[in-house]
């Protein structure tokens, strides 16, 4: 099994398959702090990250944005004082793809680095 945090996104087309229920169960175990949300029939991965202040939350948001640009896969980001909500899903397929789990794991790695600098 590939470690998600070390994987990279693959190009995704509109006809790419969503993760199956079994794949979802297997992949979510690798990112246990993430929740699966269903918004208007679209499954999404979501997690809230806590920080000591707005500046640290904003720096984390910038780091996630840079990662998203590098991978060509972009989340919804909500930055507030002391917290950032990150939501991953694949817009083209209106649901979850393996890429979303990769990016969630890589987001966790960024958060660990942010904690080290706190």
UniProtKB/Swiss-Prot annotation:
Catalytic activities: (4aS,6R)-4a-hydroxy-L-erythro-5,6,7,8-tetrahydrobiopterin = (6R)-L-erythro-6,7-dihydrobiopterin + H2O
**What one GO molecular function would you report for this record?**
4-alpha-hydroxytetrahydrobiopterin dehydratase activity
The UniProt entry, under Gene3D superfamilies, shows: Transcriptional coactivator/pterin dehydratase (3.30.1360.20)
Task: Provide this UniProt record's keywords sorted from A to Z.
Answer: Lyase
Q: Which GO terms describe its biological process?
A: tetrahydrobiopterin biosynthetic process
Instruction: Enumerate the Pfam families for this protein.
Output: Pterin_4a
> Known PANTHER family for this protein?
PTERIN-4-ALPHA-CARBINOLAMINE DEHYDRATASE-RELATED
- This chain's protein is named Putative pterin-4-alpha-carbinolamine dehydratase
UniProt organism field:
Azotobacter vinelandii (strain DJ / ATCC BAA-1303)
